[in-house]
């Protein structure tokens, strides 16, 4: 409880510091990365964090782990950013480790970590996934932004894809779409323009939300949506193939308890 309270305080402080530094960065630079980070933090990460905290207070430290953005250590010209990043980035990575360890403990001590409808997405037997999340954050902690899009964000988005938002239990997004919103909007070396990317994000999210997945509908479950979305994005060269592999593993883990329960009911 004390750790959760400390995380709440740090979130409030970090929001103020983060947005103040980003406002200065956006005012002094027109780089794509600065605008995309401000967009992701204002319109995507903060609402998702607070919605999850209200709907599932027991996972506050996990929500904190999913919320924290990273400030790039260099600006568009390759020069070092202001000294505020020297303080914020290590704190961000440290609390990410706390959030990962919280999920690891819940996976070890609980029979069902993330329930969805009448099934369970992550059980206590999924220690291998929890270990992967912990190792990913450790690698990020010691190596910095080089492992961001390959390991650290995979761990965060695989978890966040299966967290229910709202009292009705309707889930928003999937692994592929969430990862796309986090990373592709900030890529500057892509051959496509930012406007095309923004249109693709809007159309993908609107198509997912228009389907309104119900808790009893297994065909519209987040792992299945994430799998097919990641297939599309990988074929369009928006995502690395490692994301498709992670979504495939999550899809197999999702289908395994359903197949076992169906076979048990038939017998």
From Swiss-Prot:
- Please give the name of this protein: Putative uncharacterized protein YFL013W-A
Q: What else is known?
A: Partially overlaps IES1.
Membrane topology, as annotated: Multi-pass membrane protein
Q: Which UniProt keywords apply?
A: Membrane, Signal, Transmembrane, Transmembrane helix
Its source organism is Saccharomyces cerevisiae (strain ATCC 204508 / S288c)
Give me the Gene Ontology terms describing cellular component: membrane
- Signal sequence bounds: 1-27
Q: Which residues cross the membrane?
A: 125-145, 165-185
Location of this chain's protein in the cell: Membrane
């Amino acid at each position: 409880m004390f750790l959760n309270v400390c995380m709440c305080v740090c979130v409030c402080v970090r929001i103020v510091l983060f947005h103040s530094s980003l406002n200065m960065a956006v005012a002094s630079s027109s780089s794509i990365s600065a605008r995309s980070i401000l967009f992701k933090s204002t319109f995507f990460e903060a609402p998702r964090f607070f919605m999850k905290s209200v709907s599932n207070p027991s996972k506050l430290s996990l929500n904190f782990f999913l919320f924290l953005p990273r400030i790039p250590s260099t600006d568009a010209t390759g020069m070092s950013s202001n000294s505020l990043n020297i303080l914020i980035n290590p704190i961000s990575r440290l609390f990410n480790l706390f959030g990962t360890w919280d999920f690891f403990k819940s996976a070890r001590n609980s029979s069902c970590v993330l329930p969805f409808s009448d099934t369970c997405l992550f059980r206590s037997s999924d220690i291998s996934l929890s270990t992967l999340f912990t190792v990913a954050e450790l690698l990020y902690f010691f190596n910095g932004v080089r492992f961001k899009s390959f390991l650290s964000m995979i761990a965060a988005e695989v978890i966040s894809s299966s967290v229910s938002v709202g009292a009705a239990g309707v889930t928003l997004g999937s692994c592929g779409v969430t990862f796309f919103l986090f990373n592709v909007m900030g890529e500057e070396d892509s051959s496509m323009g930012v406007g095309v990317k923004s249109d693709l994000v809007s159309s993908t999210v609107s198509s997912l939300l228009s389907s309104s997945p119900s808790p009893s509908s297994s065909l519209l479950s987040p792992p299945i949506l994430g799998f097919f979305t990641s297939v599309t994005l990988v074929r369009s060269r928006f995502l690395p193939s490692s994301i498709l592999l992670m979504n495939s593993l999550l899809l197999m883990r999702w289908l395994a308890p359903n197949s076992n329960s169906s076979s048990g009911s038939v017998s």
